[in-house]
Design a protein with these regions (language model features):
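Bacterial Sec-dependent N-terminal signal peptides
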Residues: 1-21, 296-299, 339
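C-terminal outer-membrane/trafficking sorting elements
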Residues: 300-383
Length: 383
């Protein structure tokens, strides 16, 4: 991400102007001074516990670049969580890194992470049950290491273009079912989607976590709408549900995607713009604490097999949908050839959908964050 450096220099002024929210800090661990950049949203209120996201940079990158590249700050402003961007140490090749078992690194980054959580928790009101880890590339690898080696502190992880080392699963024994999201491009030339001699393939890693959490298989696979044909890639959403403690495993397969963070403002060809990785990661994290699913009655937490009442069916002028969630949902109705003919929002309770303008025929109804609710609706026409 060296190409980001010049651009980021131009963005430093807003950071300094907003210094009450963006804080540079450091702690000493194992005799090393370890730095970080902390983002605290304006809505943070001392005494009210908030989630913490650990956002780890990639190999050769740094925490400032990651703060802009895999940006969670606008989401934190509305959701209210704190996000910290730790800085790795310099390896024998002179590059910033996280110790995931590569080369001859002996840095105790797992211990540093635990100490950083302790330090931040002593200053800010952190919800100890809602601490999450994410990262780009080497930072994604490290998030998997934390899922294995610091699971008593980490509620869920998400990796972007990272994976796990070969045979790492043999010693990985999390203390609780670990919700995992993996976002990875099939054209990634840095961390190959199909793996190599040193690290496991993305499908292998995703399947291992789904099996460990005892999720339902096979996954539900949804092709995401190609909203930006100029990005040179498309996205599939693979969702494994109903794991222990309500855990799930999600994988965004970026077909034609490169070694990039989807939705990043610093994009280009091979950077998928059909999804926003940061938004999807928070949507995923927000469902879980360290004990598992927080609120099974929310839309995004509902299992894909859940039942939704859509009636009468066949219908004439109106279809009624019973929406059992507090969250506002989105629905769409498609004709048999795939054309979207109707869409809108669903509020808690009964929703009366006007179908009077539709021609008689068969339509496909879907609703929910991953289109987890589906139904075939027959429209008979006006009576």
């Amino acid at each position: 991400m060296k190409h980001l450096q010049i651009i980021i220099l131009a963005l430093l002024v807003p950071i300094l102007a907003n210094s009450q929210q963006t804080i540079e800090g450091s702690i000493t661990h194992d005799g090393l001074e370890r730095s970080y950049i902390l983002y605290v949203p304006e809505k943070y209120t001392p005494g009210t516990a908030v989630p913490l996201i650990l956002n780890f940079h990639g190999y050769t990158s740094n925490n400032l670049e990651q703060m802009f590249y895999g940006d969670f700050r606008p989401i934190a402003d509305t959701a209210g969580f704190i996000v910290v961007h730790p800085m790795g140490t310099i390896d024998q090749l002179g590059n910033p890194h996280w110790n995931v078992g590569w080369g001859a690194s002996t840095v105790n980054d797992v211990g540093f992470t635990a100490a950083l959580i302790d330090s931040l928790s002593a200053t800010y009101t952190i919800d100890a049950e809602r601490i999450y880890s994410t990262g780009m590339s080497n930072g994604g690898f490290f998030s998997y290491r934390l899922a294995c080696d610091l699971s008593d502190r980490i509620a869920a992880i998400a990796s972007v273009t990272g994976t796990m080392n070969i045979n790492q699963t043999a010693t990985c024994n999390p203390s609780h079912p670990m919700p995992v999201m993996e976002i990875h491009g099939t054209a990634d030339e840095t961390v190959a989607y199909d793996g190599n001699f040193f690290f496991a393939s993305t499908p292998t890693v995703v399947a291992w976590w789904a099996d460990r959490n005892e999720c339902d298989t096979p996954p539900t696979i949804t092709a995401m709408e190609d909203t930006d044909s100029a990005d040179g890639c498309t996205a599939e959403h693979h969702v494994y549900i109903n794991g222990n403690s309500g855990s799930s495993v999600e994988h965004y397969k970026i077909i034609g995607g490169q070694h990039t963070w989807p939705g990043s403002a610093f994009g280009g060809v091979g950077t998928n713009q059909d999804i926003d990785a940061s938004k999807e990661i928070w949507r995923f994290f927000s469902k879980y604490d360290i004990h598992g699913l927080i609120n099974p009655t929310s839309i995004s937490a509902s299992p894909l097999s859940a039942h939704l009442n859509v009636y009468p069916n066949p219908a004439n002028n109106f279809v009624i949908i019973d929406w059992p969630f507090v969250d506002v949902g989105e629905f769409s109705l498609h004709a048999t050839l795939g054309t979207e003919v109707l869409k809108g929002n669903l509020v808690s309770g009964k929703n009366e959908i006007d179908c009077s303008a539709l021609s008689p025929g068969i339509y496909f109804f879907s609703a929910g964050y991953a289109k987890q609710f589906t139904a075939v609706v027959v429209i008979q026409g006006n009576n």
